[in-house]
């Protein structure tokens, strides 16, 4: 874990466009800080993650199939070129580019450690939660377009 993340709800209130982007930021920063509360705040209970063709359906499947493996690593995830399309009052789409660095847990600062640097594209559908007012990821497709380094750093 790097540094503690900011709280789930930020002040002052964000515009819808910023709040939509913040849902993605909450999701990826939660990996980097191993913040389960932040991660849970970013997704709906019935969210779907399609990671390079592997489908995980429901928050629990995403948590156990993705989050627990990545959160124990030394990582940084960066999102850029974000485009937000608000399709309805409580629905939106986002596309963006992602860059992520991965080291085995505790090895990020060790010179010569194996790593994987990956670039990819995200296509995300989001909804605004009527209960807490937060925008959340409903369907998240991640396609890795290139990788540099050792994929074995993901070894379980």
Swiss-Prot record:
The annotated phenotype of a deletion mutant is: Does not result in significant changes in sencondary metabolites production.
Q: Which domain of life is it from?
A: Eukaryota
UniProt-listed Pfam families: SnoaL_4 (PF13577)
Q: In which pathway does it act?
A: Secondary metabolite biosynthesis
For this protein, the parts annotated as crossing the membrane are none
Q: What job does this protein perform?
A: Part of the tra gene cluster that produces terrestric acid. The clavatol biosynthesis cluster cla and the terrestric acid cluster tra are both involved in the production of peniphenones and penilactones. The non-reducing PKS claF is responsible for the formation of clavatol from successive condensations of 3 malonyl-CoA units, presumably with a simple acetyl-CoA starter unit, and 2 methylation steps. The esterase claE probably collaborates with claF by catalyzing the hydrolysis of ACP-bound acyl intermediates to free the ACP from stalled intermediates.
Please state what the protein is called.
Terrestric acid biosynthesis cluster protein E
- Organism of this sequence: Penicillium crustosum
Upper classification of the source organism reads: Eukaryota, Fungi, Dikarya, Ascomycota, Pezizomycotina
């Amino acid at each position: 874990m790097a540094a503690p993340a900011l709280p789930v709800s930020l002040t002052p209130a964000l515009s819808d466009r910023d709040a939509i982007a913040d849902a993605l930021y909450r999701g990826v920063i939660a990996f980097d800080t191993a913040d389960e509360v932040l991660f849970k705040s970013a997704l709906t209970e019935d969210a779907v993650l399609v990671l390079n063709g592997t489908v995980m359906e429901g928050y629990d499947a995403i948590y156990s199939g993705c989050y627990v493996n990545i959160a124990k690593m030394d990582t940084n995830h960066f999102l850029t070129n974000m485009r937000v399309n608000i399709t309805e009052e409580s629905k939106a789409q986002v596309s963006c580019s992602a860059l992520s660095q991965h080291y085995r847990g505790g090895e990020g600062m060790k010179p010569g450690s194996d790593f994987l640097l990956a670039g990819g594209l995200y296509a995300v559908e989001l909804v605004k939660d009527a209960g807490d007012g937060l925008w959340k990821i409903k369907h998240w497709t991640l396609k890795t377009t290139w990788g540099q380094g050792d994929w074995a750093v993901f070894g379980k």
